[in-house]
Amino acid sequence: MPLGLRRKKKFNTKETSRLVEGEHTDAAVRSLPSPPAPARRLVFHTQLAHGSATGRVENFSSIQELYAKIAGVFEIPPSEILYCTLNTPKVDMGKLLGAQIGLEDFIFAHIKGIKKEVNVYKSEDSLGLTITDNGAGYAFIKRIKDDSIIDSVKTICVGDHIEAINGENIVGWRHFDVAKKLKELKKEELFTLTLIEPKKAFDMEPRSKAGKSSTGKIGTGRETLRLRSKGPATVEEVPSEAKEKAIGKVDDLLELYMGIRDTDLATTMFEAGKDKGNPDEFAVALDETLGDFAFPDEFVFDVWGVIGDAKQE
């Protein structure tokens, strides 16, 4: 009988051990992390704006990387690309590609065309030009004001890249530096602009002055790919209507005070101020993120007013 008891105890011990081992195994299986979801593959269709076959680009995180990908598809140097428009091959300043691309957007790359030199007499302080840049070192004309000095020079067009001012090469300059240079030109003197037109299909497109542009919906869907100068690109929701309206107003202030338009810069300024409690905090945030611009105080207060209005909507 004692032997039988010992055998029974031994049997129970094995069974218990087996059960405990099984419980540990199940727990270990349950605790294993689930495999990561496969990365979302984002592919965009692209053409050269003056005409080409359709190519495909993917795996880019910045404007520079995108230009390099497009250049690789069409076997041209990246430096040939002036800028890109979304969903239209026309030189439409309201459709410029910036830091955000709708996931269904079609990318048209505008490349260098005819180079020209134009002499302009600065009879007034304001030339009537609004400057922007492509994020990769090329500044170009985004708007020409009606009845302005530049408007009277019919060979200067919206979309023209400004390569040099009075022989000084400005490739690599940001738009605000170019606008400042033009503003500082002496009144009652002649100056020379070296310009490069975007290549056109048959050199038949009419001159455009580019009316008031709107930030509008960037993509055709509800998500966009946001490009960054540092770090990976991210997929984000399309901004709300109230946010888009506020960003458009900030862009208007950039044009009024600095002679530039830049939706990406306006967006950065809005993001810097949306969680700040007063204009002093906002000014500090701008200095930390955009200190190179040296914005005038009155401009900062006006932008703060726009952000404050957006918070109340």
From Swiss-Prot:
Subcellular location(s) of the protein: Cytoplasm
Domain PDZ: 117-197
Biological process terms in GO annotation: protein localization; regulation of neurotransmitter secretion
InterPro entries associated with the record: GH2_GIPC (IPR055349), GIPC1-3_GH1 (IPR056814), GIPC1/2/3 (IPR017379), PDZ (IPR001478), PDZ_sf (IPR036034)
A Pfam match: GIPC1_GH2
GO CC annotations on file: basolateral plasma membrane; cell-cell junction; cytoplasm; plasma membrane
Top-level taxon of origin: Eukaryota
Ranges of Basic and acidic residues composition bias in the record: 14-27
Family of this protein: Belongs to the GIPC family.
Known partners and oligomeric status: Probably interacts with SEMA5A.
Protein name (Swiss-Prot/TrEMBL): PDZ domain-containing protein GIPC2
Upper taxonomic lineage: Eukaryota, Metazoa, Chordata, Craniata, Vertebrata
